[in-house]
Amino acid sequence: MAVNLTEKTAEQLPDIDGIALYTAQAGVKKPGHTDLTLIAVAAGSTVGAVFTTNRFCAAPVHIAKSHLFDEDGVRALVINTGNANAGTGAQGRIDALAVCAAAARQIGCKPNQVMPFSTGVILEPLPADKIIAALPKMQPAFWNEAARAIMTTDTVPKAASREGKVGDQHTVRATGIAKGSGMIHPNMATMLGFIATDAKVSQPVLQLMTQEIADETFNTITVDGDTSTNDSFVIIATGKNSQSEIDNIADPRYAQLKELLCSLALELAQAIVRDGEGATKFITVRVENAKTCDEARQAAYAAARSPLVKTAFFASDPNLGRLLAAIGYADVADLDTDLVEMYLDDILVAEHGGRAASYTEAQGQAVMSKDEITVRIKLHRGQAAATVYTCDLSHGYVSINADYRS
């Protein structure tokens, strides 16, 4: 069950001028499930995207990468669930291209203007014929419906919106959806994220902004430490709000727009953790006073992805030596353990290389029983900090993944 996460209504997710959404039941996932989504993009829009670092990246990832920078510009994104089209060799690419061609015919653009995305079971052929047959049957959809259509093991559709001033006079809107519940780990995971904004941004600048936003949001979460074959995060800028184009990172509007979109993306990223497979708790791990941000993130991830730490949280067991052990093996060079302080929420648990004299088991138990917990580690060796978001590891995670294909 998702941790403090509820489904957004259509009214909470405003339309973005220049974007049209469509969904259908293609029969790829399971009969009766909406499993196909098409995001139609107005001509003149720009698109930025980042993808998985998994060497076995899926066929649609290869195709999407090549179509992203095509001089004709992106006009559509087509997303299927139920099949990842990964580990499918040359035929997988042929199938992905066939889907692009069919989607292009549907909306009246070139095949190279369509970016394909897939999520689901790996090492199974993509039933491209089912997707192609369903495309003409697609119906207009709202953002909340599109969010549900891209789900796999998710239990709650993930969507969010933002509105704010960018520049002196223009109000910018942005709405996004994401999916992900398991195989979640930085760079990125079994996660798909799509954000659309009516701001006007040049493609090179939008690409850089997309990379920065992904690093600050989706690359700060972990559910199980597995990096998927299909991760993709996309930002579409339609330019329909009449502002002049942001074509330089030195433009003050760049930082304003990035802040707005970063806030939206972080909500989506945290929603993925809140809906982690079998999750019962949402945990924030913050490492402070590190020498570098990379060092801080490295230590935070060591604690956040430890199965022993995560199962202790599930059991509400203040066996907090597991956290100290994780920081110890995080490979922080020349770490002086006598300087390290560890807090559970605001309770000092460890200092001077051991248990704090003021700490009691009852204090730890009280915090561990909550459904949202913050772990704070102070290394006292610099000014850098990093925050990572994770969840506990429950019996539910094992059951969901053991039964995934049944």
From Swiss-Prot:
> Which CDD domains does the record match to this protein?
OAT (cd02152)
For this chain's UniProt record, which GO biological process terms are given? Answer: L-arginine biosynthetic process; ornithine biosynthetic process
Residues reported to bind substrate: T152, K179, T190, E277, N401, S406
InterPro entries, from UniProt?
Answer: Arg_biosynth_ArgJ (IPR002813), ArgJ-like_dom_sf (IPR016117), ArgJ_beta_C (IPR042195)
In the UniProt record, does the keyword Acyltransferase occur? yes
The molecular function GO annotations come to:
glutamate N-acetyltransferase activity; L-glutamate N-acetyltransferase activity
Q: Does the keyword Iron-sulfur apply?
A: no
**EC number from the UniProt entry:** 2.3.1.35, 2.3.1.1
Q: Which family does it belong to?
A: Belongs to the ArgJ family.
Record protein name field: Arginine biosynthesis bifunctional protein ArgJ
Gene name, per UniProt, is argJ
